[in-house]
C-alpha cells in the first residue's frame, strides 16, 4: 500500500483539512458566496473547499462555474448532500426508502458528471445533520466511501462511547465510516483533532461570507499554524485516514419518479430555500425581518 494512503499516525505526520460549504448551486454567485472571489482567497491563504452539492440540482449547473471547478481541482470539489434535501431526509428507519434515496442521489451525481464532465466525491454530507443508523447501512450498501457530519449521534442513538470521538472516523454504525466536521468557533476542538490524529473539517454556509472572507481566512491562517496541515478534498481525506481507495460506483438505474404531489413539494421547498439564500440572507434588514417572523 502507498504510504500516503495509510491511516495517519497520532500526534505525528500530516493533518488533512477541508472546508465544506453546504447547499450552493454551481452558479457564479450563490447568496453571499462568489466562487471566483473564494478561489482567490484559497490561493492566497492555501486551503481547499468542497461544496456539499444537492443532487436535486444536477441539471442546473452553470457551464462557466463548472469550468472554474474543473480548472482548479486542487482547490475546489463537490460531494453529495442528501438527495432532495428535504426535512429529516436520512433520519428515518425505513431501509428500503433510505436505499432508494442513496441510490437516487448517486444516479443524479453520475448524470451531473456525464453532462458536465465534473467528477464528484462519493461522500455523503447529511442535510440538517440528521441521519439514522439504518441510513449508514443504506449508504454502505449503495457504494459510498464515507459520510461527514456535524455530529456523530444518530437519530436512533443519542449516546456513544467516548473513544468513538477520539478516532479519525467512527465505524460504530454498520462498519461504515463517519467523520466529524466542526463550525469555525470550535477552535479548541480543532487543536484536539490535530493531537488525536484526526482530520480538520470545517463547515460553513454561504451567509458566513456576507461581509467577506476575512473571518474564514483568519481561521485558515490559524489552522495552518497547528502543524503539518495539508488542505485537500473529502475523498482524499477519507482514503488517507481509512487506508483504502474509494470503490467504483456501480451503474445506477434511473430512479422511479416521485408522485406529482411529492415532486411539487420538493420543487417549492428548493425554490423557497434559494430565494431565502439569494434575496433575504444577502440583506441585513431582510434577514432581521425573516428571523423575527420565524421566531
Task: Give the location of each predicted region.
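Metal-dependent polysaccharide deacetylase catalytic core of the NodB/CE4 family, i.e.
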Residues: 48-136, 153-159
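Well-ordered, non-membrane alpha-helical segments in soluble/globular domains
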Residues: 31-41, 61-66, 95-108, 212-222
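C-terminal active-site subregion of NodB/CE4 polysaccharide deacetylases
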Residues: 1-28, 137-269, 273-283
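Short, well-structured alpha-helical interface segments that form or flank functional binding sites
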Residues: 33-37, 119, 130-134, 197, ...
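Active-site beta->alpha N-cap acidic-glycine motif
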Residues: 2-75
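Loop/turn elements at helix/coil->beta-strand transitions in domains of secreted/extracellular proteins
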Residues: 14-16, 45-50, 74-77, 118-121, ...
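Conserved anion/nucleotide-ligand pocket segment
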Residues: 280-294
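Alpha-helical structural signal in soluble globular domains
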Residues: 41, 45, 68, 108, ...
